[in-house]
Amino acid sequence: AMRAPALGAEVVGVRRSVRPGAPCPDYCLRVVPQSELDAELPQADLVALSLPGTPETLHMFDAARLARCKQGAILLNVGRGSTVDCLALADAVHSGHLFGAALDVTDPEPLPSDHPLWSEPNVIITPHISGRFSLAKTLDNIVEIFIHNLKLYAAGQPVDNQVSRTTHYVSGGSGGQRLVCGMP
C-alpha cells in the first residue's frame, strides 16, 4: 500500500474503527471505518486483505461481499485464509465478475488439489510465504522483539504486541516497540 501511490494508485485504508482526529498515513487518500467497506468496494480495482482470523472476520468476503466488488477487480489476500470464502471466490473469478485473485493464504490451507481455484488461470496461489520470515532481517526482528518482551515479562510489565484473547487484535503493552503489521 505504501508504494502504490508511486504507481499512480489511490489507496483507501479500511480499519475496524477509525478514531476521530487520528492521522491518515501519508500513502492513503483516506481511512474509513469498516462500516463503510461495502461503499468502497465498487470503486476498488484491487482489494488487498491483511486481516486477522477472528470470529468477526470469518468469511467476511463471502459471495455477497465479493458481488459488491467492482467488475474486473482483483482480490489479494495475505492475511488469514478464513476471511475469504474460497468457493465463492472461485465462482466470482470463474464468472468473470472478478478478473482474478492472488492468494498467499486459503481456507482450507493447504487448498485441496481438486479445489476449483486451482483451475482458474487468473488466480495465483503461493504457499503462505508473503511474510518473508525466511529473510535474515525478519528473523533478527523476531529475536529482538522476543528479547525485549522477555525483559518486560521478567520485570513484571506487560509485553508488547500481545494479542488480546477477546478482540484477537494486538493490545497495549509497555509503550515500547510496536512492530505490528498493518496500518498504524
Ranges and model annotations:
Residues 1-10:
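Conserved anion/nucleotide-ligand pocket segment
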Residues 72, 78-184:
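Rossmann-like dinucleotide-binding domain for NAD(H)/NADP(H)
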Residues 11, 64-69, 142-146:
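A short, gly/pro- and small-residue-rich
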